[in-house]
Amino acid sequence: MKNKEFLVIYSDIIITTGAIKMILVDTSRNKVFELPKSFSNLINDLKNYPVTELRLKYDDKNFDSFVKFILDQDLGMMTPYPEMFPNVDQSFSSPEYINNSILEFYPSESYEKYGERIQKLDDLGCKFYEFRMHLPIEMTILESIFKRVVFNNLKSINILSLNSSKLEDENYLIILRKFPFIKSICVFGSPVEANIKEESLMEDQRLYYIKEALDNKNCGKVSLSNLFIRGTDQIVENISHNSCLHKKVAVDNDGNIKNCPSMQRCYGNIDKNDLLEIVDNTSFKKLWNLTKDKIDICKDCEFRYLCTDCRAYTDMSKFDEQGLDISKPLKCGYNPYSGEWAEWSTNPLKQHAIKYYGMQ
């Protein structure tokens, strides 16, 4: 029995192969492990051959080091029954018309209209919201908004707000305590950067300050620090759909509906038009299924299913037969062919696009 043992990698480990590297994503522990691409054939053989045969097929030293790595990192186990560890089903489906939305807020005499907009989004199944508030956040404003909404699908709200010298940590913490579905408040334009975690908050709630201005042009940055692991479902969605725009609606301050706040095209107005008709329109959904496997350069990147695929700002260097921009996101400095990160803004090949978007 011993010589028929197999090394199996756990089903919640998602493996992605790039041009020269591969990664093993542990979705349960939110960890990423890198390996040379040369191990990909070995990994593909694991369920087909017992370890005794694999040791003969591959270099003894490398094979034993690989087995030790998998077991030490708790990424797999030895078993005589590999059939008991089926692969994760990578098909994705969700019933809601809209899953996530971004709403812009500006100073107003009345904030009730924002609540009415949120209700329309909730009616279409929206679960996740980002409030981009171009004003200092206040309890009275949120109360005015939320009193107009009966949430049936809400899971979380993240708030981006302008800094105010009149507001202290406690002002924001009071809001987080009162509304546990608000998972984070990010204060933009702060003189200092800080990440506040208070014991009185729920485990998944955060308050943080950043110096950066609250500007749509600051969106779409790709770096190691913002490659988030959101669980198996999110990665599976990213495999089959666009990781940024799938089932997303952006509503600007005037009620105009877009795929993303940074994009120019408007598809209608949430205050004047039927929201379902807009989001169910083929033209609105045309980018929803533009996956990373179709994006130039990204298709060869090991991080492609962890990355948010920005379509608002791209290198503008590659288009498909239908005219869709399939260029790499402008603000990514990673080269999957060398495995190295570099500053994107100084790349000579990106200067034309940088000038076009007015980011000089």
Question: What positions do the PLM features span?
Answer:
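Acidic, low-complexity/disordered tracts enriched in E/D and polar residues
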Residues: M1-L46
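A C-terminal junction/extension of Radical SAM enzymes
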Residues: K2-L7, F181-C260, L306-D309
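Long, charge-rich, low-complexity alpha-helical segments
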Residues: K31-Y129, E143, K147, S184, ...
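Concave beta-strand-loop units of leucine-rich repeat
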Residues: F105-P107, M133-L135, I159-L162, V187-P191
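Local cysteine-cluster metal-coordination motifs and their immediate loop/turn environment
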Residues: K294-D315, L330-Y337
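Short linker/helix segments within small regulatory modules
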Residues: M316-S327
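Short Fe-S-cluster ligation motifs
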Residues: I326-Q360
